UniProtKB/Swiss-Prot annotation:
It comes from Escherichia coli (strain K12). Changing residue 373 to K: Lethal, wild-type protein levels. GO terms for cellular component: Bam protein complex; cell outer membrane; membrane. This is Outer membrane protein assembly factor BamA. Residues 24-91, 92-172, 175-263, 266-344, 347-421 form the POTRA domain. Changing residue 661 to A: Slow growth on solid and liquid media, less protein accumulates which is more proteinase sensitive. Disruption phenotype: Deletion is lethal. Depletion results in the accumulation of incorrectly assembled outer membrane proteins, including TolC, OmpF, OmpC and OmpA. Decreased expression leads to decreased susceptibility to contact-dependent growth inhibition (CDI), and decreased expression of outer membrane proteins (including in this study LamB) as well as up-regulation of periplasmic protease DegP. Contains 5 N-terminal periplasmic polypeptide transport-associated (POTRA) domains which interact with other subunits of the complex, may recruit substrates from the periplasm into the outer membrane and also act as a chaperone. The C-terminal region forms a discontinuous 16-stranded beta-barrel transmembrane region. The central pore is ellipsoid, and probably closed by extracellular loop 6, perhaps with the aid of other loops. Changing residue 740 to A: Slow growth on solid and liquid media, less protein accumulates which is more proteinase sensitive.
């Protein structure tokens, strides 16, 4: 074999040998050491080809090119006559990647970061990249206060030049803050300043926000909080001079020292606005008014800038620039604020597009828009469209993106990006209580039928005491102006005695039609007509029931077990809704008020009216809306007209998952008081507790609920982040702690006539319960679990601590 002459060795592992400036002509190229990399692929990555004249520089470029592929650990190029011999050592191939000891960082996140760096199964192992990843992960742990953490890559060789890569984590413990010192503060105590920090050196048990575990990011946020605290109180020259963070020798403790210069308090002497105001100087002037002698306030200055931007944004100036420059006068301790405004170009909307609505038709979304195509861009109108889409309840998230049109100086496209949720639900409910046992209900509801926006529902109940069926359809846009049209058909066969209610049977059917009229963005009115037929039978003689029958001109017998009565009623139905919730499902901010009522009209057998008012208010207590306080109320009242009473079967009831949890459904409130009758199979001593006056059985009280013509229910709820749930599912699961209270009463009950019996006209007989609830927007529909313990109840009340329902949320 001819003697091989070394041309150039690896740039990393050996020095270059100059062969000659004149070079030589390459007749052939051979490779040694290739295993996984194909010869053709290696040749394509080289700048040298057969027939080329090469010199030292060409060889250097060849080695660089081969190294740049990332496939080789070592590259040597030698000459054998006119043949170029390339000796390579391939990097090993990664056969598997595993992790050990990582608790703070999930495997999926690690895999994503590794893949972003080109480290994945089947690729070559780059030890330099692995070293960078080790350092990056350790830096991450240091940033969250885990200074004893270490990350080591363990590479295990395998046959055929393969390796197993294992990242071994030793996370250690988070360093806890031992002390936070603020040096230079005179106007405020250190405790007062630290009380606004997230990081604390002491955290009382009730503080769910404070944290002793050091995190670099949280410290940066706390320093900004400190700066804002002073700037908001007039200290215009406040400065954070330095911050020292020192570790204890065992790396488990942190001492933080913040050196500040407070300076003096300054007052605003005036605001001067200049620049391109786009003809809105008067409106901008209103936004920049200040009170004489008002302290300089950094937050108010920022808000003023934002308000000016929002104002201009409403008129199509999508990208205004607003810059405030404080002019400080140290002599008289005043600040003059100079505000420079550049409105920029006015933009018009070329197109409004929707993304992510795979089920919902574009027209369903487009009709909720307040921003029009071809008109100037109004930021408030774009936001209104987002709010309206959220309130539909069809989408889990709604985001907006304003995109400039390429090549156009004054046009944009507005894109609404939605993530659809399952708007259909299979409504299945189950409850269990010591007295009630197990109860069921079922139904199907689709709020966005075939993507048209129609709400279609088929609901039914079949159990020991009820057979109920209902078909409902609502078109929210019966007209282009947003007038809605809804209709309903129903049938109900109700055996009250089997439902622990007052004994009677009611077979009813009916229909109603309702029109809805939008008043403005948040208010709407409803009006409609209804018809219902009631066929009552098996009415046991009971005081409230007989009182109603007497008012209707009936004279039922207390000795007859089969009293019957039929009515046909026509009603005028009305309603009003105010809805300013931020979302249709799982809202976190805003209020909703719903008033519904009905009154009989001429041609009806009954004469009565009935009104119900529901309210709900959500108040977020953090910026991310993860901690929310919810207050709900329900008020109901009804009464007869023209000397008649409201039918007993229209009474209000309370108890159950939608009113007062922890109590069996519909069992709160007045109980039946029966008249003893003469039937041979009737035994009042067995069936009821009867009062005896002058040796006669006069009245018998029971635990059978009869409801009342008045109701009041309230609930206070504290919504919290759900433990062990990732951010991905945060919008689908909700956990809350609640306190429910409610009562039902009968304003027509005359307690003076029924001494020895509870006063069912007293509204102060309030029931209370407390517990925890979990709601989940599952593929079947909304699932609601609750466990409640009644802590204020009365004789005859029936507890049902655990309740489970599919198809109902609040």
């Amino acid at each position: 074999m001819a003697m091989k002459k070394l041309l150039i060795a690896s740039l990393l592992f050996s020095s270059a040998t100059v062969y000659g400036a004149e070079g030589f002509v390459v007749k052939d190229i051979h490779f040694e050491g290739l295993q996984r990399v194909a010869v053709g692929a290696a040749l394509l990555s080289m700048p040298v080809r057969t027939g080329d004249t090469v010199n030292d520089e060409d060889i250097s470029n060849t080695i660089r090119a081969l190294f740049a592929t990332g496939n080789f650990e070592d590259v040597r190029v030698l000459r054998d006559g006119d043949t170029l011999l390339v000796q390579v050592k391939e990097r090993p191939t990664i056969a598997s990647i595993t992790f050990s000891g990582n608790k703070s960082v999930k495997d999926d996140m690690l895999k994503q970061n590794l893949e972003a760096s080109g480290v994945r199964v089947g690729e070559s192992l780059d030890r330099t990249t692995i070293a960078d990843i080790e350092k990056g992960l350790e830096d991450f742990y240091y940033s969250v206060g885990k200074y004893s953490a270490s990350v080591k890559a363990v590479v295990t060789p395998l046959p055929r030049n393969r390796v197993d890569l294992k990242l071994v984590f030793q996370e250690g413990v988070s360093a806890e803050i031992q002390q936070i010192n603020i040096v230079g503060n005179h106007a405020f105590t250190t405790d007062e300043l630290i009380s606004h920090f997230q990081l604390r050196d002491e955290v009382p048990w009730w503080n769910v926000v404070g944290d002793r575990k050091y995190q670099k990011q949280k410290l940066a946020g706390d320093l900004e909080t400190l700066r804002s605290y002073y700037l908001d109180r007039g200290y215009a020259r406040f400065n954070i001079d330095s911050t020292q963070v020192s570790l204890t020798p065992d790396k488990k403790g942190i001492y933080v020292t913040v050196n500040i210069t407070e300076g003096d308090q300054y007052k605003l002497s005036g605001v001067e606005v200049s620049g391109n105001l786009a003809g809105h100087s008067a409106e901008i002037e209103q936004l920049t008014k200040i009170e004489p002698g008002e302290l300089y306030n950094g937050t108010k200055v920022t808000k003023m800038e934002d308000d000016i931007k929002k104002l201009l944004g409403r008129y199509g100036y999508a990208y205004p620039r607003v810059q405030s420059m404080p002019e400080i006068n140290d002599a008289d301790k005043t600040v003059k604020l100079r505000v420079n405004v550049d409105a920029g170009n006015r933009f018009y909307v070329r197109k409004i597009r929707f993304e992510g609505n795979d089920t919902s038709k574009d027209a369903v979304l487009r009709r909720e828009m307040r921003q029009m195509e071809g008109a100037w861009l109004g930021s408030d109108l774009v936001d209104q469209g987002k709010e309206r889409l959220n309130r539909l309840g069809f989408f889990e998230t709604v985001d907006t993106d304003t995109q400039r049109v390429p090549g156009s100086p004054d046009q944009v496209d507005v894109v609404y990006k939605v993530k659809e949720r399952n708007t259909g639900s299979f409504n299945f409910g189950i409850g269990y209580g010591t007295e009630s046992g197990v109860s069921f209900q079922a139904g199907v509801q689709q709020d966005n039928w075939l993507g048209t926006g129609y709400a279609v529902g088929i609901n039914g109940t079949k159990n020991d005491y009820q057979t109920y069926a209902e078909l409902s359809v609502t078109n929210p846009y019966f007209t282009v102006d947003g007038v809605s049209l809804g209709g309903r058909l129903f049938y109900n066969d109700f055996q009250a005695d089997d439902a622990d209610l007052s004994d009677y049977t009611n077979k009813s059917y009916g229909t109603d039609v309702t029109l809805g009229f939008p008043i403005n963005e948040y208010n709407s009115l409803r009006a409609g007509l209804g018809y219902v037929h009631n066929s009552l039978s098996n009415m046991q003689p009971q005081v409230a029931m007989w009182r109603y029958l007497y008012s209707m001109g009936e004279h039922p017998s207390t000795s007859d077990q089969d009293n019957s009565f039929k009515t046909d009623d026509f009603t005028f139905n009305y309603g009003w809704t105010y809805n300013k919730l931020d979302r249709g499902y799982f809202p976190t901010d805003g209020s909703r008020v719903n008033l519904t009522g009905k009154v009989t009209i001429p041609g009806s057998d009954n004469e009565y009216y009935k009104v119900t008012l529901d309210t709900a208010t959500y108040v977020p207590i953090d910026d991310d809306h993860k901690w929310v306080v919810l207050g709900r109320t329900r008020w109901g009242y009804g009464d007869g007209l023209g000397g008649k009473e409201m039918p007993f079967y229209e009474n209000f009831y309370a108890g159950g998952s939608s009113t007062v949890r922890g109590f069996q459904s519909n069992t709160i409130g007045p109980k039946a008081v029966y008249f003893p009758h003469q039937a041979s199979n009737y035994d009042p001593d067995y069936d009821y507790e009867c009062a005896t006056q002058d040796g006669a059985k006069d009245l018998c009280k029971s635990d059978d609920a009869v409801g009342g013509n008045a109701m009041a229910v309230a609930s206070l709820e504290f919504i919290t982040p759900t433990p062990f749930i990732s951010d991905k599912y945060a919008n689908s699961v909700r956990t809350s702690f609640f306190w429910d209270m409610g009562t039902v009463w009968d304003t027509n009950w005359d307690s003076s006539q029924y001494s020895g019996y509870p006063d069912y006209s007293d509204p102060s007989n309030i029931r209370m319960s407390a517990g925890i609830a979990l709601q989940w927007m599952s593929p079947l529909g909304p699932l609601v679990f609750s466990y409640a313990q009644p802590f204020k109840k009365y004789d005859g009340d029936k507890a049902e601590q655990f309740q489970f329902n599919i198809g109902k949320t609040w």
